[in-house]
From Swiss-Prot:
It comes from the Bacteria. This is Dihydroxy-acid dehydratase. The keyword Transferase does not apply. It holds the Pfam family ILVD_EDD_N. Mg(2+) binds at residues 81, 123-124, 489. InterPro entries: Dihydro-acid_dehy_C, DihydroxyA_deHydtase, DiOHA_6PGluconate_deHydtase_CS, ILV_EDD_C, ILV_EDD_N, IlvD/EDD_N. Its cofactor is [2Fe-2S] cluster; Mg(2+). One of its GO terms (molecular function) is 2 iron, 2 sulfur cluster binding. Keywords: 2Fe-2S, Amino-acid biosynthesis, Branched-chain amino acid biosynthesis, Iron, Iron-sulfur, Lyase, Magnesium, Metal-binding. Homodimer. The gene is ilvD. Pathway: Amino-acid biosynthesis; L-isoleucine biosynthesis; L-isoleucine from 2-oxobutanoate: step 3/4; Amino-acid biosynthesis; L-valine biosynthesis; L-valine from pyruvate: step 3/4. It comes from Pseudomonas putida (strain GB-1). Functions in the biosynthesis of branched-chain amino acids. Catalyzes the dehydration of (2R,3R)-2,3-dihydroxy-3-methylpentanoate (2,3-dihydroxy-3-methylvalerate) into 2-oxo-3-methylpentanoate (2-oxo-3-methylvalerate) and of (2R)-2,3-dihydroxy-3-methylbutanoate (2,3-dihydroxyisovalerate) into 2-oxo-3-methylbutanoate (2-oxoisovalerate), the penultimate precursor to L-isoleucine and L-valine, respectively. The keyword Magnesium applies.
């Protein structure tokens, strides 16, 4: 049987000093024989998705101690992408993922913790903690803060979210009063932004990976039902410890649960629900940390056979996360994938012996369990609040309409090909990514003239100054992991194109990335990035570019000979922006850039550079 890791600091005469310090934290004699379970919280008052997490770590801690464990809580940082967006703050967002992963590793290994409860929610926090969990490979469970309620206003016939506020603000025809009303209404409660943006996408994927409880991705932050997820997580992590340390059951370890097949399940879910393209970046990074050979070619393969079974804002205005929950949440989508013969159902999870068993219990179309049906009726109260578990509103009925509802069956899919696609071509030899769920079918094949911008800032200025015309393909380069550094999100350029009426008349290609709130023909993650010698750095104003989503291709319509000549010329100049950018790149960001790989590798550190150290 494996020993508790914590035995290193709790047992033996030589550890008297360490035990003295443990006692100063409140531990007693009997506690030194129990598993020490780390609670990695991410509470901060900077982020609406985390503002309500302050007391939830102790809620979990009390449940852990009731179940026979010792709980010790610590905090990580959390960056709000929406607040950091549109200025140099966005340079820090993706690098914060690595800092979070390192922080969890540092705390857990420094104190020899036996297991982890990860309390995450927003964009980089769940991925960072997931990377750490797979590095450490000790029992873990994820429980997130949950999505916020969609906004409501008499000025709109649909639920609102952050993107609506951004788009209306960029619309010069909208009055100041209307903009103010949207601003006040778009984000009414605590929780991660209400659409299928990056945060909610990742929290849903933890369910598919088998590392979180059913409902983790869809139960509203404000709803009383979410409290039970935290309490159950506390009990479950102690049970996982007993199985691993007491029974030598390695099937409960994260690398046993989140194996190659589980990553395929998670990616199939992402494609089926039209999730954020950022999830591709984060899944690739997590796979590397878990030593799972899952790469962009696997994602390309899956994208060709998985239909889109769910459509949520920003891909459609009608539905938000509260509607996904009402339709049965993630296990209803997984159930549809299973019945379509795609899902791997023989895999264990932290809560069930197999995914098949979990679907039978939690898919509302497969179970008659009234408690499960009641759980998925949890809905919004429409009351602005920053308090978790503060309301208990329920829908009168479930949305189990698989023909016209939020979640569809295979036979009635929104589209037979899923919501994400990987494109390859001479402009992106290692691939680039587009969220097809947000692209109008009329522009799935698009040929246009390149309009070059050397930064997101210059692109925003150009779009607002009407320099971009219908038929243009906006190229924003040197914004990759290394070139930015930090791989900024491009939500403002896409929002402004939309507000200018160019959402279906233009495309955008970048080696940066996009917010989960992005829609339109927006192609990101171009790899290799410009700063790494990628061909996106060779494009010139007026060059023709052909995008062909059905054939998964994107090509610069320039001869190989011309490209070779341009490469020789660029090698002499150096792979850097053609214009000076007024951007302060600190030592911390330079350190990140030094080791950063391109997006096709998940933008993780280049471990080859560290070998031998």
């Amino acid at each position: 049987m494996p020993d508790y890791r914590s035995k290193t600091s709790t047992q033996g005469r030589n550890m008297a000093g360490a035990r003295a310090l443990w006692r100063a934290t409140g531990m007693k004699d009997e506690d030194f024989k129990k598993p020490i379970i780390a609670i990695a919280n991410s509470f901060t008052q900077f982020v609406p998705g985390h503002v309500h997490l302050k007391d939830l770590g102790q809620l979990v801690a009390r449940e852990i101690e009731r179940a026979g464990g010792v709980a010790k809580e610590f905090n990580t940082i959390a960056v709000d992408d929406g607040i950091a967006m549109g200025h140099d703050g966005m340079l820090y967002s993706l690098p914060s993922r690595e800092i979070i992963a390192d922080a969890v590793e540092y705390m857990v290994n420094a104190h020899c913790a036996d297991a982890i409860v990860c309390i995450s929610n927003c964009d980089k926090i769940t991925p960072g903690m997931l990377m750490a969990a797979l590095r450490l490979n000790i029992p873990v469970i994820f429980v997130s803060g949950g999505p916020m309620e969609a906004g409501k206003t008499k000025l709109a016939s649909h639920g609102l979210d952050l993107v609506d506020a951004m788009v209306i603000a960029a619309d010069s025809s909208a009055s100041d009063e209307k903009v103010a009303e949207y601003e006040r209404s778009a984000c009414p409660t605590c929780g991660s932004c209400s659409g299928m943006f990056t945060a909610n996408s990742m929290n849903c994927l933890t369910e598919a990976l088998g590392l979180a409880l059913p409902g983790n991705g869809s139960t509203l932050a404000t709803h009383a039902d979410r409290e039970q997820l935290f309490l159950t997580a506390g009990r479950t992590i102690v049970e996982l410890c007993k199985r691993y340390y007491g029974e030598n059951d390695e099937s409960v370890l994260p690398r046993s649960i989140a194996n190659f097949k589980a990553f395929e399940n998670a990616m199939m879910l992402d494609i089926a629900m039209g999730g954020s393209t950022n999830t591709i970046l984060h899944l690739l990074a997590a796979a590397q940390e878990g030593e799972v050979e899952f790469d962009l070619r696997d994602i390309d393969r899956l994208s060709r056979k998985v239909p889109q079974l769910c459509k949520v804002a920003p891909n459609i205005q009608k539905y938000h996360m509260e509607d996904v929950h009402r339709a049965g949440g993630i296990f209803s989508i997984l159930g549809s994938l299973a019945r379509g013969g795609l899902l791997h159902t023989d895999l264990p999870t932290v809560h069930s012996r197999s995914m098949e068993e979990a679907i039978a219990k939690w898919d509302i179309t497969q179970t008659d369990d009234e408690a499960v049906h009641t759980f998925f009726k949890a809905g919004p109260a429409g009351i602005p609040t920053q308090t978790a578990f503060s309301q208990s509103t329920r829908w009168e009925t479930l949305d189990d309409d698989r023909e016209n509802g939020c979640i569809r069956s295979f036979e009635h899919a929104y589209s037979q090909e899923g919501g994400l696609a990987v494109l390859y071509g001479n402009i992106a030899l290692d691939g680039c990514v587009v969220k097809t769920a947000g692209v109008d079918e009329s522009i799935h094949v698009f040929e246009g003239n390149a309009k070059i911008f050397e930064s997101q800032d210059s692109a925003v200025r150009g779009i607002l100054a009407d320099e971009v015309k219908a038929g243009d393909i906006v190229i924003i380069r040197y914004e990759g992991p290394k070139g930015g550094p930090g791989m900024q999100e491009m939500l403002y350029p896409t929002s402004y194109l939309k507000s200018k009426g160019l959402g279906k008349a233009c495309a955008l290609l970048t080696d940066g990335r996009f917010s989960g709130g992005t829609s339109g023909l927006s192609i990101g993650h171009a790899s290799p990035e410009a700063a790494a010698g990628g061909a996106i750095g060779l494009v010139r104003d007026g060059d023709k570019v052909l995008i062909d989503i059905p054939n998964r291709s994107i090509n610069l319509l320039v001869s190989d000979e011309e490209l070779a000549e341009r490469r020789v010329e660029q090698d002499k100049k150096g792979w850097k922006p053609a214009e000076v950018r007024p951007r302060k790149v600190t030592t911390a960001l330079k350190a990140y850039a030094l080791l950063a790989t391109s997006a096709d590798k998940g933008a993780v550190r280049n471990k080859a550079m560290l070998e031998g150290l």
